[in-house]
Amino acid sequence: MTVGVLQLELSIPSAFSLKDKRQVVKSLKDRIGHAHNVSVAEVGALDEHRRSIVAVAMVSNDKRYVEGALSKLVDYVRLDPEAVLQDYQIELL
């Protein structure tokens, strides 16, 4: 069994309040979760309106599948017009 964790550090330049940020983050979390069958949560920078840290988790019996799927998720997030990907980390357990 392989557990993959992807941590995304995002910048949200269009957010002028926490409400604006939450709309962008919720939309991104919903799209990621529904399209890729993963668990998604905002885990950091909760009180900063222009920054967010989002974690994505996935479990599979195939290590290569998890690594590939999380890499594709990084590419998917890079295409988001409202959230700018600043950094990411993939960890396989």
Language model segments and positions:
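Amphipathic alpha-helical assembly/interaction segments
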Residues: S17, S27, R31-G33, N37-G44, ...
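Short, charge-patterned binding micro-sites
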Residues: V3, A41-D62, E91
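C-terminal structural segments of small proteins and small subunits
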Residues: M58-L93
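Short glycine-/aliphatic-rich beta-strand segments at the starts of folded cytosolic domains
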Residues: G4-P13, L18
